[in-house]
Amino acid sequence: MKRNYQPSRVKRARTHGFRARMATAGGRKVLSRRRKKGRYKLTVSNEKLGKKY
């Protein structure tokens, strides 16, 4: 049986990445809240998603 979470770095970055957040008013609100709260990572883009080390 196939489970719900089928990880893909590209999909993750496109849906939850910085540029995706900046593209909508709601996303910008998310970023400002996370800045205000002092989150170490604002978005998943800060995880070096597509990078091969």
UniProtKB/Swiss-Prot annotation:
One GO BP annotation of this record: translation
Single GO molecular function: structural constituent of ribosome
InterPro entries membership: Ribosomal_bL34 (IPR000271), Ribosomal_bL34_CS (IPR020939)
Keywords: Ribonucleoprotein, Ribosomal protein
Pfam families in the cross-refs: Ribosomal_L34
Transmembrane intervals: none
One term under GO cellular component: ribonucleoprotein complex
NCBIfam families, per the entry: rpmH_bact (TIGR01030)
PANTHER family reported for this sequence: LARGE RIBOSOMAL SUBUNIT PROTEIN BL34M, MITOCHONDRIAL RIBOSOMAL PROTEIN 34 FAMILY MEMBER
Annotated HAMAP family: Ribosomal_bL34
Recorded family membership: Belongs to the bacterial ribosomal protein bL34 family.
Protein name: Large ribosomal subunit protein bL34
Organism encoding this protein: Leptospira borgpetersenii serovar Hardjo-bovis (strain JB197)
Gene: rpmH
